[in-house]
Amino acid sequence: MTLFTHSIRHRITFLAVCIAACIFALSMLVSTLDSRDNALKAAQDNARLLAEREAARLEGELKRTFTSARTLAQALQGMKAAGTPPSREQIDHAMREMLQQTPDVLSYGSLWEPNALDGRDSEYAGRAPSHDKTGRYLPYWNRASGQIAVEPLVDYDKPGANDWYVVPQKTLQDIFTDPYPYKVAGREVLVATVSTPVMVADKFMGVVALDYPLEGLQKSLSEVRPFGSGYAALVSNGGFYASHPNDKLLGKKADTLSPQALE
């Protein structure tokens, strides 16, 4: 074998080794990238499953709470449709009892169209605490002071502040408002309102509503720690934070989240 032949063979062998090394390195790189992608996908899948599980749990809790407003609305519309509307005092008693039995609810309230309840608004004009000067029945049973008490609903004719009334009035559907701050026992808490229409013969009569403080929900979600260092947040249908580890973001627009995160 000549020196030239030996040199060529050596170079071919060296080149083959280099190619093999490059192929091995590329294989390792592809394998690493695949592993990283698989790990990322697995993490995303796990996070989505956790979110779906928590969402289902919260949905169940909220449905149980909100059913009370719908149940009262259905009872009132049933009696009204039968021609035996309950007295205002009976409705007051029912809402007070409901509030006592649902400690996680801040308040129950009801507002009827003029003379829609019993045609006696003029008799009740200015008779506090369940009426204002119009005589419309508009009690607001609440525990904002720390004790259960009733006062007349306000701002029901103020645009923006009366969505809990005008939206069910127009859509004939329930509404769950975006969170907003409200003072309870001297301190400000985040609250959402659920309002359901009272319908008789397909005609809007009024609403039954409840205010739900989001503190309990906030505390429950604060215990959810995906992968030990993550956090869970709840965004309302209107795109506002109903729950977030950063209290400063509560009730604020969730405009930093990606569209995928809001799906």
Task: Outline where the language-model segments fall.
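Conserved beta-strand cores of small sensory beta-sandwich domains that regulate signal transduction
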Residues: 70, 109, 231-233
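Short loop/turn microsegments at loop-to-beta-strand junctions
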Residues: 106, 193-194, 229-231
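Extracellular/periplasmic ligand-sensing ectodomains of membrane signal-transduction proteins
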Residues: 100-174, 179-186, 241-261
